[in-house]
């Protein structure tokens, strides 16, 4: 049999299904901070459904719970842990300006 006429066979790899991020016993509630904090980015943004691997209903409930927690000041609207490094950038530009003069 010619090499060009051989059927292309793809090797099958084993597939391991990931566990769902929300178990059946978990209650989606604005007070459940350990659950809610898993679905928020470092910046404080709500992660998308594709990233969270949630169903549409679960994502809707998580979004509502996060918004309620933000309004009640349980969660910040923005997480500003990363401060802008203005000191380095201004120091660099100030040094360049001083050299040109």
From Swiss-Prot:
One GO cellular component term: mitochondrial small ribosomal subunit
Entry superkingdom: Eukaryota
Endpoints of the signal sequence: none
Compartments where located: Plastid, Chloroplast
InterPro entries per the UniProt record, alphabetical: Ribosomal_bS18, Ribosomal_bS18_CS, Ribosomal_bS18_sf
GO molecular function, one term: structural constituent of ribosome
GO biological process, one term: translation
Keywords (A to Z) from UniProt: Chloroplast, Plastid, Ribonucleoprotein, Ribosomal protein, RNA-binding, rRNA-binding
Stated family: Belongs to the bacterial ribosomal protein bS18 family.
Record note on quaternary structure: Part of the 30S ribosomal subunit.
Name this protein carries in UniProt: Small ribosomal subunit protein bS18c
Species name: Panax ginseng
Lineage: Eukaryota, Viridiplantae, Streptophyta, Embryophyta, Tracheophyta
Name of the gene: rps18
């Amino acid at each position: 049999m010619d090499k060009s006429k051989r059927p292309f066979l793809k090797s099958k790899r084993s597939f391991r299904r990931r566990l769902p991020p929300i178990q059946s016993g978990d209650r989606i509630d604005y007070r459940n901070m350990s659950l809610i904090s898993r679905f928020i980015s470092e910046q404080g943004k709500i992660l998308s459904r594709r990233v969270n691997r949630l169903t549409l209903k679960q994502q809707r409930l998580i979004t509502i719970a996060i918004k309620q927690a933000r309004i009640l000041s349980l969660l910040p609207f923005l997480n500003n842990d990363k401060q802008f490094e203005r000191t380095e950038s201004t120091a660099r530009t100030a040094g360049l300006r001083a050299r040109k003069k």
